[in-house]
């Protein structure tokens, strides 16, 4: 793992990127960063506000800049936003600057994990399942393209998934 010290987590909303990322960082004594949190810190507003005011395109532009900045750090675990892989530049930076782990999960698990979360602007709809299915259709191939590893998170605790990732990296 020496040549690629950073660990970047990609996957859909509700896959567990932030929770698993915190466990990974703690166990590996690395810094944990969340691109959505950094966007909120830099704008002084939450993601939903950025979406409302700047639209998805404005948000994606901000996200691309944050991904560029954060992937230049050393020794980090980065939880990316679910749509970060839409940008080819972001995919290239993630691939070049760290080990990319795709956290895969089912639509059912995504719904269960996100149903009470009001901070997900794309899910503020009467048909969240349809939105998640459309996003999966658009993004799953991009997650696979950019990833070095794929890990299912459906019925496992964040700690178990973090341990699986550590084991994969050690076997590398």
UniProtKB/Swiss-Prot annotation:
GO CC, one annotated term: cytosol
Biological process terms in GO annotation: amino acid biosynthetic process; aromatic amino acid family biosynthetic process; chorismate biosynthetic process
Pfam (any one): SKI
Record's cofactor remark: Binds 1 Mg(2+) ion per subunit.
The UniProt record lists the keyword Transmembrane: no
Pathway given in the UniProt record: Metabolic intermediate biosynthesis; chorismate biosynthesis; chorismate from D-erythrose 4-phosphate and phosphoenolpyruvate: step 5/7
Keywords: Amino-acid biosynthesis, Aromatic amino acid biosynthesis, ATP-binding, Cytoplasm, Kinase, Magnesium, Metal-binding, Nucleotide-binding, Transferase
Superkingdom of the source species: Bacteria
Catalytic reaction(s) noted: shikimate + ATP = 3-phosphoshikimate + ADP + H(+)
Predominant location category: cytoplasm
EC number of this enzyme: 2.7.1.71
Binding site for substrate: 36, 60, 82, 139
Cofactor(s) for this UniProt protein: Mg(2+)
Residues engaged in binding ATP: 14-19, 120, 156
GO function terms (MF aspect): ATP binding; magnesium ion binding; shikimate kinase activity
Stored SUPFAM superfamilies: P-loop containing nucleoside triphosphate hydrolases (SSF52540)
Cellular compartments annotated: Cytoplasm
Keyword Transmembrane helix: no
UniProt cross-references to InterPro entries, sorted A to Z: P-loop_NTPase, Shikimate/glucono_kinase, Shikimate_kinase/TSH1, Shikimate_kinase_CS
Binding site for Mg(2+): 18
Subunit note: Monomer.
Family indicated by similarity: Belongs to the shikimate kinase family.
Its biological purpose: Catalyzes the specific phosphorylation of the 3-hydroxyl group of shikimic acid using ATP as a cosubstrate.
Name used for this protein in its record: Shikimate kinase
Underlying gene: aroK
